[in-house]
Protein backbone atom coordinates (compact mmCIF):
# COMPACT_ATOMS: atom_id res chain seq x y z
CA UNK A 1 0.00 0.00 0.00
CA UNK A 2 1.17 3.53 -0.76
CA UNK A 3 0.57 6.62 1.35
CA UNK A 4 -2.34 8.50 -0.22
CA UNK A 5 -0.71 11.81 0.74
CA UNK A 6 2.66 10.93 -0.77
CA UNK A 7 3.65 12.92 -3.87
CA UNK A 8 5.40 11.38 -6.86
CA UNK A 9 7.10 12.69 -9.98
CA UNK A 10 7.94 11.06 -13.32
CA UNK A 11 11.18 11.38 -15.25
CA UNK A 12 11.58 10.30 -18.87
CA UNK A 13 15.06 9.77 -20.30
CA UNK A 14 15.33 9.64 -24.10
CA UNK A 15 18.44 7.75 -25.17
CA UNK A 16 19.82 6.82 -28.57
CA UNK A 17 17.80 3.62 -29.01
CA UNK A 18 15.08 3.73 -26.36
CA UNK A 19 13.24 5.82 -23.82
CA UNK A 20 13.01 5.05 -20.10
CA UNK A 21 10.39 6.27 -17.64
CA UNK A 22 10.79 6.18 -13.87
CA UNK A 23 8.29 6.98 -11.11
CA UNK A 24 9.96 8.55 -8.09
CA UNK A 25 8.92 9.53 -4.58
CA UNK A 26 9.26 13.28 -4.41
CA UNK A 27 10.40 13.38 -0.79
CA UNK A 28 13.34 10.95 -0.87
CA UNK A 29 14.07 9.88 -4.47
CA UNK A 30 12.98 6.27 -4.09
CA UNK A 31 12.35 4.79 -7.54
CA UNK A 32 9.13 2.82 -7.31
CA UNK A 33 8.49 1.93 -10.94
CA UNK A 34 10.37 1.93 -14.23
CA UNK A 35 9.82 0.84 -17.82
CA UNK A 36 11.67 1.00 -21.14
CA UNK A 37 10.32 1.35 -24.67
CA UNK A 38 12.54 0.65 -27.68
CA UNK A 39 12.28 2.98 -30.69
CA UNK A 40 10.54 1.19 -33.55
CA UNK A 41 12.58 3.04 -36.18
CA UNK A 42 15.84 2.91 -34.24
CA UNK A 43 18.67 4.90 -35.81
CA UNK A 44 18.45 5.36 -39.57
CA UNK A 45 22.06 5.63 -40.74
CA UNK A 46 21.98 3.67 -43.98
CA UNK A 47 18.50 4.28 -45.38
CA UNK A 48 15.06 5.66 -44.55
CA UNK A 49 12.24 3.21 -43.89
CA UNK A 50 11.14 3.46 -47.54
CA UNK A 51 14.61 2.48 -48.76
CA UNK A 52 15.86 5.97 -49.60
CA UNK A 53 19.61 5.63 -49.15
CA UNK A 54 21.63 7.91 -46.89
CA UNK A 55 25.19 9.16 -47.47
CA UNK A 56 28.03 8.37 -45.05
CA UNK A 57 27.99 9.88 -41.54
CA UNK A 58 24.22 10.40 -41.41
CA UNK A 59 22.12 9.46 -38.37
CA UNK A 60 18.38 10.15 -38.37
CA UNK A 61 15.38 9.27 -36.22
CA UNK A 62 11.59 9.42 -36.42
CA UNK A 63 9.84 11.63 -33.84
CA UNK A 64 6.89 9.27 -33.56
CA UNK A 65 9.19 7.01 -31.57
CA UNK A 66 9.47 9.72 -28.92
CA UNK A 67 5.70 10.03 -28.54
CA UNK A 68 5.44 6.24 -28.36
CA UNK A 69 7.68 6.31 -25.29
CA UNK A 70 5.06 8.49 -23.59
CA UNK A 71 2.30 6.13 -24.74
CA UNK A 72 4.07 2.98 -23.56
CA UNK A 73 6.89 3.49 -21.06
CA UNK A 74 5.10 5.97 -18.80
CA UNK A 75 1.91 3.88 -18.34
CA UNK A 76 4.04 0.77 -17.83
CA UNK A 77 6.16 2.49 -15.18
CA UNK A 78 3.00 3.69 -13.43
CA UNK A 79 1.60 0.17 -13.48
CA UNK A 80 4.84 -1.26 -12.10
CA UNK A 81 4.85 1.30 -9.28
CA UNK A 82 1.40 0.41 -8.02
CA UNK A 83 0.70 4.02 -7.07
CA UNK A 84 -2.43 6.03 -7.68
CA UNK A 85 -1.62 8.18 -10.76
CA UNK A 86 -3.45 11.05 -9.07
CA UNK A 87 -0.52 11.34 -6.63
CA UNK A 88 1.85 12.34 -9.46
CA UNK A 89 2.49 16.09 -9.40
CA UNK A 90 4.99 16.60 -12.22
CA UNK A 91 6.85 15.16 -15.20
CA UNK A 92 10.21 16.08 -16.71
CA UNK A 93 12.19 14.84 -19.70
CA UNK A 94 15.77 14.76 -20.86
CA UNK A 95 17.24 13.94 -24.25
CA UNK A 96 20.43 13.24 -26.12
CA UNK A 97 21.77 16.45 -27.63
CA UNK A 98 22.18 17.93 -30.06
CA UNK A 99 19.19 16.03 -31.51
CA UNK A 100 17.06 18.42 -33.56
CA UNK A 101 13.59 18.40 -35.10
CA UNK A 102 12.51 20.38 -38.17
CA UNK A 103 8.88 21.33 -37.51
CA UNK A 104 6.08 23.57 -38.70
CA UNK A 105 4.76 26.44 -36.60
CA UNK A 106 2.39 24.14 -34.70
CA UNK A 107 5.12 21.61 -33.93
CA UNK A 108 4.36 19.07 -36.66
CA UNK A 109 7.62 17.38 -37.74
CA UNK A 110 8.23 17.83 -41.45
CA UNK A 111 8.89 14.12 -41.93
CA UNK A 112 5.27 13.44 -40.96
CA UNK A 113 4.03 15.51 -43.91
CA UNK A 114 3.42 13.20 -46.92
CA UNK A 115 5.32 15.44 -49.33
CA UNK A 116 8.47 15.17 -47.20
CA UNK A 117 8.33 11.51 -46.19
CA UNK A 118 11.19 10.60 -48.55
CA UNK A 119 13.34 13.65 -47.81
CA UNK A 120 16.18 12.80 -45.38
CA UNK A 121 16.58 16.39 -44.21
CA UNK A 122 12.98 16.39 -42.98
CA UNK A 123 13.78 13.80 -40.31
CA UNK A 124 15.23 14.25 -36.84
CA UNK A 125 18.99 14.67 -36.92
CA UNK A 126 20.37 12.57 -34.09
CA UNK A 127 23.24 13.80 -31.93
CA UNK A 128 25.66 11.52 -33.76
CA UNK A 129 24.75 12.83 -37.21
CA UNK A 130 28.23 13.89 -38.36
CA UNK A 131 27.52 14.72 -42.00
CA UNK A 132 27.70 18.46 -41.30
CA UNK A 133 31.44 18.46 -40.57
CA UNK A 134 32.30 20.60 -43.59
CA UNK A 135 29.67 23.10 -42.51
CA UNK A 136 31.11 23.17 -39.00
CA UNK A 137 34.57 23.75 -40.48
CA UNK A 138 33.28 26.83 -42.32
CA UNK A 139 31.59 28.17 -39.19
CA UNK A 140 34.84 27.76 -37.27
CA UNK A 141 36.98 29.34 -39.98
CA UNK A 142 34.75 32.39 -40.38
CA UNK A 143 34.30 32.83 -36.64
CA UNK A 144 38.05 32.71 -36.11
CA UNK A 145 38.66 35.10 -39.00
CA UNK A 146 36.15 37.60 -37.63
CA UNK A 147 37.19 37.15 -34.01
CA UNK A 148 33.70 36.19 -32.86
CA UNK A 149 33.61 36.45 -29.06
CA UNK A 150 31.57 33.28 -28.61
CA UNK A 151 34.06 30.91 -30.26
CA UNK A 152 36.49 30.66 -27.29
CA UNK A 153 33.56 29.69 -25.05
CA UNK A 154 33.47 26.43 -27.01
CA UNK A 155 37.17 25.72 -26.87
CA UNK A 156 37.78 27.37 -30.23
CA UNK A 157 35.69 24.97 -32.32
CA UNK A 158 32.03 24.37 -33.02
CA UNK A 159 31.06 20.71 -33.46
CA UNK A 160 29.33 19.20 -36.47
CA UNK A 161 26.87 17.70 -33.97
CA UNK A 162 25.44 21.10 -33.00
CA UNK A 163 22.49 23.16 -34.17
CA UNK A 164 24.07 25.68 -36.51
CA UNK A 165 26.13 23.16 -38.49
CA UNK A 166 23.10 20.92 -38.93
CA UNK A 167 20.84 23.82 -39.89
CA UNK A 168 23.38 25.11 -42.40
CA UNK A 169 23.53 21.67 -43.97
CA UNK A 170 19.74 21.67 -44.43
CA UNK A 171 19.83 25.21 -45.83
CA UNK A 172 22.43 24.33 -48.46
CA UNK A 173 21.34 20.80 -49.35
CA UNK A 174 17.52 20.95 -49.30
CA UNK A 175 16.24 24.50 -49.56
CA UNK A 176 12.60 23.38 -49.75
CA UNK A 177 12.80 21.55 -46.42
CA UNK A 178 14.57 24.54 -44.92
CA UNK A 179 11.91 26.94 -46.19
CA UNK A 180 9.08 24.84 -44.75
CA UNK A 181 10.81 24.56 -41.37
CA UNK A 182 9.27 27.14 -39.06
CA UNK A 183 10.89 25.82 -35.89
CA UNK A 184 14.34 24.21 -35.75
CA UNK A 185 14.10 22.83 -32.24
CA UNK A 186 15.95 20.51 -29.88
CA UNK A 187 14.13 17.22 -29.36
CA UNK A 188 13.98 17.79 -25.60
CA UNK A 189 12.08 21.04 -26.21
CA UNK A 190 9.92 19.45 -28.90
CA UNK A 191 8.72 16.57 -26.70
CA UNK A 192 8.08 19.04 -23.88
CA UNK A 193 5.95 20.98 -26.37
CA UNK A 194 3.94 17.82 -27.05
CA UNK A 195 3.39 17.36 -23.32
CA UNK A 196 2.24 20.87 -22.40
CA UNK A 197 1.09 22.34 -25.71
CA UNK A 198 3.47 25.31 -25.59
CA UNK A 199 6.87 25.85 -27.14
CA UNK A 200 9.69 26.44 -24.68
CA UNK A 201 13.46 26.58 -25.10
CA UNK A 202 15.82 25.61 -22.29
CA UNK A 203 19.02 27.41 -21.35
CA UNK A 204 21.08 24.21 -21.43
CA UNK A 205 20.74 23.21 -25.08
CA UNK A 206 20.61 26.83 -26.22
CA UNK A 207 23.95 27.46 -24.58
CA UNK A 208 25.83 24.25 -25.28
CA UNK A 209 24.41 23.31 -28.68
CA UNK A 210 22.94 26.59 -29.97
CA UNK A 211 25.87 28.98 -29.42
CA UNK A 212 23.78 31.23 -27.17
CA UNK A 213 26.21 33.36 -25.16
CA UNK A 214 25.82 36.63 -23.27
CA UNK A 215 22.15 36.82 -24.17
CA UNK A 216 22.46 36.35 -27.92
CA UNK A 217 22.95 33.86 -30.74
CA UNK A 218 25.46 34.48 -33.56
CA UNK A 219 24.49 37.62 -35.45
CA UNK A 220 22.51 37.75 -38.68
CA UNK A 221 25.50 39.48 -40.25
CA UNK A 222 27.76 36.54 -39.37
CA UNK A 223 25.26 33.97 -40.66
CA UNK A 224 24.71 35.83 -43.93
CA UNK A 225 28.46 36.06 -44.46
CA UNK A 226 28.60 32.33 -43.82
CA UNK A 227 26.03 31.59 -46.52
CA UNK A 228 23.95 34.31 -48.24
CA UNK A 229 20.31 33.95 -47.24
CA UNK A 230 21.08 32.12 -44.00
CA UNK A 231 21.09 35.34 -42.01
CA UNK A 232 17.48 35.09 -40.82
CA UNK A 233 17.89 31.58 -39.36
CA UNK A 234 17.87 32.75 -35.74
CA UNK A 235 15.01 35.23 -36.05
CA UNK A 236 12.84 33.01 -38.26
CA UNK A 237 13.37 29.50 -36.92
CA UNK A 238 15.27 29.45 -33.63
CA UNK A 239 14.73 32.47 -31.42
CA UNK A 240 12.39 32.10 -28.45
CA UNK A 241 12.56 33.23 -24.81
CA UNK A 242 14.78 30.87 -22.82
CA UNK A 243 13.57 29.14 -19.66
CA UNK A 244 15.85 28.14 -16.77
CA UNK A 245 16.27 24.49 -15.83
CA UNK A 246 13.68 23.37 -13.31
CA UNK A 247 11.11 25.92 -14.46
CA UNK A 248 7.53 24.98 -15.23
CA UNK A 249 6.92 24.83 -18.99
CA UNK A 250 3.17 24.45 -18.56
CA UNK A 251 0.51 21.98 -17.53
CA UNK A 252 0.02 18.50 -18.98
CA UNK A 253 -2.52 18.67 -21.81
CA UNK A 254 -5.58 16.45 -21.98
CA UNK A 255 -4.10 14.67 -25.00
CA UNK A 256 -0.79 13.97 -23.24
CA UNK A 257 -2.69 12.87 -20.14
CA UNK A 258 -4.42 10.32 -22.34
CA UNK A 259 -1.09 9.05 -23.65
CA UNK A 260 0.58 8.75 -20.27
CA UNK A 261 -2.19 7.97 -17.80
CA UNK A 262 -1.13 10.99 -15.73
CA UNK A 263 -3.50 13.70 -14.45
CA UNK A 264 -4.08 16.60 -16.81
CA UNK A 265 -2.69 19.90 -15.60
CA UNK A 266 0.26 18.58 -13.57
CA UNK A 267 3.55 20.44 -13.92
CA UNK A 268 5.60 19.80 -17.04
CA UNK A 269 9.21 20.78 -16.50
CA UNK A 270 11.37 22.59 -19.04
CA UNK A 271 13.39 20.08 -21.09
CA UNK A 272 16.94 19.08 -20.22
CA UNK A 273 19.92 17.06 -21.54
CA UNK A 274 20.69 13.51 -20.43
CA UNK A 275 24.18 14.25 -19.12
CA UNK A 276 23.57 17.60 -17.45
CA UNK A 277 20.38 16.48 -15.73
CA UNK A 278 22.29 13.65 -14.03
CA UNK A 279 24.45 15.99 -11.93
CA UNK A 280 21.93 16.54 -9.10
CA UNK A 281 20.94 12.86 -9.16
CA UNK A 282 24.58 12.07 -8.32
CA UNK A 283 24.74 14.78 -5.64
CA UNK A 284 27.61 16.29 -7.64
CA UNK A 285 26.59 19.93 -7.83
CA UNK A 286 29.67 21.22 -6.00
CA UNK A 287 32.41 22.79 -8.17
CA UNK A 288 35.21 20.37 -9.07
CA UNK A 289 33.03 17.26 -9.18
CA UNK A 290 33.39 16.06 -12.77
CA UNK A 291 30.48 13.80 -13.65
CA UNK A 292 31.19 11.29 -16.43
CA UNK A 293 28.03 9.75 -17.84
CA UNK A 294 29.46 6.64 -19.46
CA UNK A 295 27.46 4.70 -22.02
CA UNK A 296 27.72 4.46 -25.80
CA UNK A 297 29.61 7.75 -25.50
CA UNK A 298 30.75 9.73 -22.47
CA UNK A 299 29.72 13.24 -21.56
CA UNK A 300 31.72 15.06 -18.90
CA UNK A 301 29.91 17.84 -17.06
CA UNK A 302 30.94 19.94 -14.07
CA UNK A 303 30.01 23.11 -12.26
CA UNK A 304 32.52 25.88 -11.64
CA UNK A 305 32.62 29.24 -9.94
CA UNK A 306 34.73 31.03 -12.56
CA UNK A 307 34.26 31.62 -16.28
CA UNK A 308 37.22 30.13 -18.15
CA UNK A 309 37.81 29.39 -21.81
CA UNK A 310 39.07 25.80 -22.10
CA UNK A 311 40.54 24.54 -25.41
CA UNK A 312 38.51 21.81 -27.08
CA UNK A 313 35.66 21.85 -24.60
CA UNK A 314 32.01 21.53 -25.62
CA UNK A 315 31.08 24.79 -23.94
CA UNK A 316 30.75 26.82 -20.79
CA UNK A 317 27.27 28.17 -20.05
CA UNK A 318 26.07 30.36 -17.21
CA UNK A 319 23.42 28.24 -15.47
CA UNK A 320 23.83 25.49 -18.06
CA UNK A 321 23.79 22.74 -15.44
CA UNK A 322 22.78 24.41 -12.18
CA UNK A 323 21.55 27.99 -11.75
CA UNK A 324 24.22 30.10 -10.07
CA UNK A 325 27.22 28.23 -11.49
CA UNK A 326 29.12 28.16 -14.75
CA UNK A 327 28.49 24.75 -16.27
CA UNK A 328 31.29 23.08 -18.22
CA UNK A 329 30.90 20.27 -20.75
CA UNK A 330 33.35 18.03 -22.56
CA UNK A 331 32.98 14.56 -24.00
CA UNK A 332 34.11 11.49 -25.90
CA UNK A 333 32.08 10.54 -28.97
CA UNK A 334 32.69 6.83 -28.61
CA UNK A 335 33.19 4.68 -25.50
CA UNK A 336 30.73 1.81 -25.10
CA UNK A 337 30.17 1.98 -28.85
CA UNK A 338 33.87 1.19 -29.35
CA UNK A 339 33.71 -1.85 -27.10
CA UNK A 340 30.57 -3.04 -28.90
CA UNK A 341 32.17 -2.48 -32.32
CA UNK A 342 35.13 -4.65 -31.34
CA UNK A 343 32.94 -7.44 -29.95
CA UNK A 344 30.56 -7.38 -32.91
CA UNK A 345 33.21 -7.37 -35.62
CA UNK A 346 36.62 -8.58 -34.48
CA UNK A 347 36.26 -11.19 -31.73
CA UNK A 348 36.67 -14.85 -32.78
CA UNK A 349 33.63 -17.07 -32.29
CA UNK A 350 35.49 -19.20 -29.76
CA UNK A 351 35.29 -16.38 -27.22
CA UNK A 352 31.55 -16.12 -27.70
CA UNK A 353 31.24 -19.86 -27.13
CA UNK A 354 33.31 -19.63 -23.94
CA UNK A 355 31.21 -16.73 -22.68
CA UNK A 356 28.00 -18.62 -23.42
CA UNK A 357 29.30 -21.66 -21.55
CA UNK A 358 30.04 -19.43 -18.55
CA UNK A 359 26.66 -17.70 -18.92
CA UNK A 360 28.21 -14.26 -19.06
CA UNK A 361 28.43 -11.66 -21.81
CA UNK A 362 31.37 -11.51 -24.20
CA UNK A 363 32.21 -8.12 -22.70
CA UNK A 364 32.48 -9.64 -19.23
CA UNK A 365 34.50 -12.57 -20.56
CA UNK A 366 37.02 -10.39 -22.39
CA UNK A 367 37.31 -8.04 -19.42
CA UNK A 368 38.04 -10.90 -17.04
CA UNK A 369 40.58 -12.52 -19.36
CA UNK A 370 42.56 -9.29 -19.52
CA UNK A 371 42.05 -8.09 -15.95
CA UNK A 372 45.04 -9.81 -14.35
CA UNK A 373 47.56 -8.78 -16.98
CA UNK A 374 50.16 -6.30 -15.66
CA UNK A 375 49.79 -2.74 -16.90
CA UNK A 376 51.48 -2.53 -20.30
CA UNK A 377 51.72 -6.30 -20.58
CA UNK A 378 49.92 -6.30 -23.91
CA UNK A 379 52.34 -3.80 -25.49
CA UNK A 380 49.46 -1.83 -27.01
CA UNK A 381 48.18 1.73 -27.10
CA UNK A 382 44.95 2.75 -28.81
CA UNK A 383 43.29 6.00 -29.83
CA UNK A 384 39.60 6.15 -28.88
CA UNK A 385 38.46 8.03 -31.98
CA UNK A 386 36.32 5.39 -33.68
CA UNK A 387 33.41 7.86 -33.63
CA UNK A 388 35.63 10.89 -34.03
CA UNK A 389 36.96 13.12 -31.27
CA UNK A 390 34.63 15.42 -29.37
CA UNK A 391 37.14 16.75 -26.83
CA UNK A 392 39.66 18.16 -27.07
CA UNK A 393 40.17 18.08 -30.85
CA UNK A 394 36.53 18.51 -31.92
CA UNK A 395 36.93 16.63 -35.20
CA UNK A 396 34.57 13.83 -36.16
CA UNK A 397 36.63 12.86 -39.20
CA UNK A 398 39.29 11.39 -36.95
CA UNK A 399 39.28 7.61 -36.57
CA UNK A 400 40.40 4.87 -34.22
CA UNK A 401 43.84 3.32 -34.02
CA UNK A 402 45.57 0.43 -32.24
CA UNK A 403 49.35 0.32 -32.31
CA UNK A 404 51.70 -2.43 -31.13
CA UNK A 405 49.90 -5.53 -32.40
CA UNK A 406 51.90 -8.66 -33.23
CA UNK A 407 51.00 -12.17 -34.31
CA UNK A 408 50.81 -13.04 -30.62
CA UNK A 409 48.31 -10.31 -29.72
CA UNK A 410 44.98 -11.67 -28.47
CA UNK A 411 41.42 -10.36 -28.51
CA UNK A 412 41.32 -9.78 -24.72
CA UNK A 413 44.51 -7.73 -24.98
CA UNK A 414 43.08 -5.48 -27.68
CA UNK A 415 39.85 -5.17 -25.72
CA UNK A 416 41.76 -4.03 -22.66
CA UNK A 417 43.76 -1.55 -24.73
CA UNK A 418 40.46 -0.07 -25.91
CA UNK A 419 39.22 0.20 -22.31
CA UNK A 420 42.44 1.99 -21.41
CA UNK A 421 42.23 4.30 -24.43
CA UNK A 422 38.90 5.69 -23.25
CA UNK A 423 40.42 6.31 -19.81
CA UNK A 424 43.34 8.12 -21.44
CA UNK A 425 40.84 10.27 -23.33
CA UNK A 426 39.17 11.25 -20.07
CA UNK A 427 42.56 12.07 -18.53
CA UNK A 428 43.31 14.33 -21.50
CA UNK A 429 40.07 16.20 -20.82
CA UNK A 430 40.83 16.54 -17.09
CA UNK A 431 44.33 17.85 -17.76
CA UNK A 432 42.97 20.40 -20.21
CA UNK A 433 40.44 21.67 -17.67
CA UNK A 434 43.08 22.03 -14.98
CA UNK A 435 45.58 23.72 -17.30
CA UNK A 436 42.88 26.33 -17.97
CA UNK A 437 42.28 27.07 -14.30
CA UNK A 438 39.25 24.82 -13.77
CA UNK A 439 40.14 22.32 -11.01
CA UNK A 440 38.86 18.74 -11.03
CA UNK A 441 38.84 17.23 -7.54
CA UNK A 442 36.68 14.15 -7.98
CA UNK A 443 35.46 11.91 -10.79
CA UNK A 444 31.84 10.81 -10.40
CA UNK A 445 30.64 8.08 -12.75
CA UNK A 446 27.09 7.44 -13.90
CA UNK A 447 25.73 5.28 -16.71
CA UNK A 448 25.77 1.61 -17.57
CA UNK A 449 29.55 1.20 -17.76
CA UNK A 450 30.02 1.77 -14.02
CA UNK A 451 29.06 -1.91 -13.59
CA UNK A 452 32.44 -2.90 -15.07
CA UNK A 453 34.69 -2.90 -11.98
CA UNK A 454 37.85 -3.46 -14.01
CA UNK A 455 37.08 -0.46 -16.20
CA UNK A 456 36.38 1.70 -13.15
CA UNK A 457 39.70 0.76 -11.54
CA UNK A 458 41.49 1.55 -14.80
CA UNK A 459 39.91 5.02 -14.78
CA UNK A 460 40.99 5.60 -11.17
CA UNK A 461 44.55 4.48 -11.95
CA UNK A 462 44.83 6.42 -15.21
CA UNK A 463 43.37 9.68 -13.89
CA UNK A 464 44.97 9.42 -10.46
CA UNK A 465 41.69 10.39 -8.82
CA UNK A 466 39.16 8.65 -6.58
CA UNK A 467 36.06 7.45 -8.38
CA UNK A 468 32.64 7.91 -6.84
CA UNK A 469 29.55 6.21 -8.25
CA UNK A 470 25.97 7.34 -8.57
CA UNK A 471 23.62 4.95 -6.75
CA UNK A 472 20.73 5.11 -9.20
CA UNK A 473 20.83 3.01 -12.35
CA UNK A 474 18.52 5.58 -13.97
CA UNK A 475 20.54 8.73 -13.35
CA UNK A 476 19.14 10.87 -16.18
CA UNK A 477 15.53 9.80 -15.59
CA UNK A 478 15.94 10.42 -11.86
CA UNK A 479 17.46 13.83 -12.58
CA UNK A 480 14.51 14.68 -14.82
CA UNK A 481 12.12 13.61 -12.07
CA UNK A 482 14.01 15.83 -9.61
CA UNK A 483 13.66 18.84 -11.90
CA UNK A 484 9.95 17.98 -12.22
CA UNK A 485 9.72 18.14 -8.43
CA UNK A 486 11.18 21.65 -8.55
CA UNK A 487 8.76 22.66 -11.32
CA UNK A 488 5.87 21.31 -9.23
CA UNK A 489 6.96 23.35 -6.21
CA UNK A 490 7.98 20.41 -4.02
CA UNK A 491 11.43 21.99 -3.63
CA UNK A 492 12.42 25.63 -4.06
CA UNK A 493 15.45 24.75 -6.18
CA UNK A 494 17.43 21.84 -7.61
CA UNK A 495 20.01 22.01 -4.80
CA UNK A 496 17.33 21.12 -2.28
CA UNK A 497 16.00 18.38 -4.53
CA UNK A 498 19.50 16.95 -4.93
CA UNK A 499 20.06 16.73 -1.17
CA UNK A 500 16.72 14.98 -0.61
CA UNK A 501 16.46 12.79 -3.71
CA UNK A 502 20.00 12.19 -4.98
CA UNK A 503 22.53 9.59 -3.80
CA UNK A 504 26.22 8.80 -4.29
CA UNK A 505 28.79 6.22 -3.14
CA UNK A 506 31.97 8.18 -2.56
CA UNK A 507 35.51 6.96 -3.20
CA UNK A 508 34.53 3.46 -4.29
CA UNK A 509 37.68 3.13 -6.41
CA UNK A 510 41.03 4.57 -5.37
CA UNK A 511 44.10 4.86 -7.62
CA UNK A 512 46.78 2.27 -6.90
CA UNK A 513 50.17 4.04 -6.94
CA UNK A 514 52.13 1.27 -8.69
CA UNK A 515 49.54 0.80 -11.43
CA UNK A 516 49.06 4.56 -11.77
CA UNK A 517 52.79 5.04 -12.35
CA UNK A 518 52.80 2.30 -14.99
CA UNK A 519 49.86 3.95 -16.73
CA UNK A 520 51.77 7.23 -16.77
CA UNK A 521 54.24 5.60 -19.16
CA UNK A 522 51.49 4.33 -21.47
CA UNK A 523 49.79 7.71 -21.33
CA UNK A 524 52.95 9.36 -22.65
CA UNK A 525 52.61 7.20 -25.77
CA UNK A 526 48.88 7.92 -25.99
CA UNK A 527 49.64 11.65 -25.85
CA UNK A 528 52.28 11.32 -28.55
CA UNK A 529 49.82 9.51 -30.82
CA UNK A 530 47.11 12.04 -29.91
CA UNK A 531 49.27 14.96 -30.99
CA UNK A 532 50.69 13.23 -34.08
CA UNK A 533 47.38 12.10 -35.58
CA UNK A 534 45.34 14.94 -34.09
CA UNK A 535 46.05 17.24 -37.03
CA UNK A 536 43.74 14.90 -38.92
CA UNK A 537 45.57 14.95 -42.24
CA UNK A 538 46.05 11.20 -42.63
CA UNK A 539 42.75 10.15 -41.08
CA UNK A 540 40.75 12.72 -43.05
CA UNK A 541 42.42 11.54 -46.24
CA UNK A 542 41.53 7.93 -45.51
CA UNK A 543 37.92 8.90 -44.79
CA UNK A 544 37.76 10.91 -48.03
CA UNK A 545 39.10 7.94 -49.99
CA UNK A 546 36.48 5.69 -48.39
CA UNK A 547 33.61 8.10 -49.03
CA UNK A 548 34.66 8.55 -52.65
CA UNK A 549 34.90 4.79 -53.13
CA UNK A 550 31.46 3.99 -51.73
CA UNK A 551 29.83 6.90 -53.57
CA UNK A 552 30.85 5.68 -57.03
Question: Over which residues does each language-model region extend?
Answer:
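Short, hydrophobic/amphipathic alpha-helical packing segments
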Residues: 67-75, 164-167, 273-277, 335, ...
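Conserved phosphate-binding catalytic cores of ATP/NTP-utilizing and phosphoryl-transfer enzymes
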Residues: 1-5, 253-262, 272-289
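A polyampholytic, Gly/Pro-enriched intrinsically disordered region
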Residues: 55-60, 133-158, 288-291, 486-499
Amino acid sequence: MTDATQQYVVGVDYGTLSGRAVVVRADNGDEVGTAVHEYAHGVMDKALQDGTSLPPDWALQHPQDYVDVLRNAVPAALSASGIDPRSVVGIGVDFTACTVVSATADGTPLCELPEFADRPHAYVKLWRHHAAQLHADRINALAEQRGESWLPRYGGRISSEWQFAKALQVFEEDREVYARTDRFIEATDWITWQLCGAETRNTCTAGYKGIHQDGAYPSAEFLDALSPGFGDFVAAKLEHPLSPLGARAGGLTDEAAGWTGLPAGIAVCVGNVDAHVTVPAAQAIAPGQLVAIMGTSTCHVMNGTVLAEVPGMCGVVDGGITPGYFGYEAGQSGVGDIFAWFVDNLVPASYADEAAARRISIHEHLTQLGADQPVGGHGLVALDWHSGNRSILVDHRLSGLVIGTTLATTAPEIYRALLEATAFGTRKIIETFEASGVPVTELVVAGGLLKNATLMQIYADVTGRPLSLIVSEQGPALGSAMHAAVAAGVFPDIVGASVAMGSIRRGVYQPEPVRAKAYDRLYEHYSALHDHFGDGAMMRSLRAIKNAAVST
